[in-house]
């Protein structure tokens, strides 16, 4: 029964993405993602929702504003094709992303939890997290390990960036607090 539910969710999600793509409002629609990046982003969101269905949770909804913020944070890495950039460059992108994200978060009454978001080390360099696993089993394992998707999260912002042939990702899940 769980497999049937998972398959149904994946089929419905895929059908919805096809319709939205045709209408110009798809996940990543209007963004600067390449077709390969959009496909990786869709695969990640589908895997997250399949995981949630297996836990008897509602599928999580992608929020366009939150995803735009994630895309802004990954943009300096994509533009330079590096997994390491100056902390100053990343802080600038992070400020821009937070300025976009914060009003939406307040409007929706949500708190957020980041996953695989770039971080700055003691040398003041910003680094990307792990690349997106290529194998489905590894992707499922990563999603289960992140833990926060087990919670009552209702929205997600996510983006991916292809850097030197590898897909890197960042996402932020949001749950209602008010």
Residue ranges and their predicted role:
Residues 24-27:
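Bacterial signal peptide processing site
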Residues 10-13, 59:
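Enrichment for repetitive, rod-forming helical segments
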Residues 91-178:
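A well-ordered secondary-structure block
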Residues 13, 53, 75, 79-82, ...:
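Generic surface-pattern signal
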Residues 19-22:
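C-terminal motif of bacterial Sec signal peptides marking the signal peptidase cleavage site
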Residues 29-102, 156:
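Short, well-ordered surface patches within globular domains
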Residues 1-11:
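Bacterial N-terminal signal peptides that target proteins for export
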